[in-house]
Amino acid sequence: MNILITGGLGFIGSHLSYELDKNHNITIMDNFDLNYPGYAKIFRGSKQGVPRISKLEEFHREINVKYRFELIKKSKASVHRQWSFEKISYNNPLLYDLIINCGGLSEAILSKYFSEFCFDSIVKGTENIKTIYSCPIIHISSSMVYGSWEGKIDEDYLQKPVDKYGFNKLYSEQFCDEKDIILRPIHVYGIGDSKFPIWMNIERQIEKDKPVNVEAADCIYIDDFVEIVKNIIANWMPGTYNISSNLIRDGQVLQKIYPKDFIVNNKLGPTGKPRGMLDSSKLFDTFGVKLKYNTYEETIRDYYGKYENLRSQQ
């Protein structure tokens, strides 16, 4: 199958590109580099805004970006250096059998500060590829379309986004049609995540002698995310699906696995109460999904092992 992956140099996109390249012909559309909006910035609260990253944060971001680029080098994927919202020259509508749309501003909290790029990369990019190409797409939307919630919610829950990122993700969904699949993930984590890797957060807080904030929220490990997408491609059934593992982030697990001592502060969600979960039973039932990892601790052990191996190669 000929597959186009927009945002294929990003966290989720690079993993999908690498794995799907084993059985498909992959083309990547992405213009990511170190000038990417927000790469050298990090959110430090409403008072400080988005100042430049520290040397420690820069180190972690660099090694994760390098990891993603190495994944692509190991594949046979061809890379077109442009954004999906720009004019596309290779515009034969029958060029691809499938598009996986991962393009978009990578961090929701930055949508307030990079609003134009957020809109262009999420909304205009989706409209552009849906206008040009006739094949179905897997559109990577976000649980942020629901805004804030409590308890467990399914795909019919009221969509009430609370920030520009969520609004743009919801807006972008309208370009999808009856042959497409929309995925709404929550907190995807793992090796290659350069925006806010777990280990960067722990180490910078240790450096500042401050507690590590951990929100007990739903999430999904990148390895499981990729396996689910492979399953979806093999058993296509159009529709909108929540995608999560229902494994809850746990600061005590991080304390157990990370070798240095640190204090955990259990953070509440934006409502002042524990953040809600996604009901992903529709996805699991439709595609017969089985997760590779049964516990949050298993994913964190795997993540930390890969991270330390990556760090040792620097």
Per-region residue spans from a language model:
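Amphipathic terminal alpha-helices
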Residues: 294-314
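NAD(P)-dependent short-chain dehydrogenase/reductase
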Residues: 151, 162, 174-224, 257
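Glycine-rich Rossmann NAD(P)(H)-binding loop
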Residues: 188-192, 211-220, 241-249, 258, ...
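NAD(P)H-binding glycine-rich loop region in Rossmannoid oxidoreductase-like domains
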Residues: 76-121
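N-terminal Rossmann/SDR dinucleotide-binding element
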Residues: 1-95
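Conserved Rossmann-fold NAD(P)-dependent oxidoreductase catalytic core, especially the SDR/UDP-sugar
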Residues: 101, 127-164, 181
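Mid/C-terminal beta-alpha module of Rossmann-like enzyme folds, strongest
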Residues: 228-274, 279-280
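Glycine-rich NAD(P)-binding loop of the Rossmann-fold in SDR/ketoreductase-type enzymes
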Residues: 113-128, 159, 163, 167-170, ...
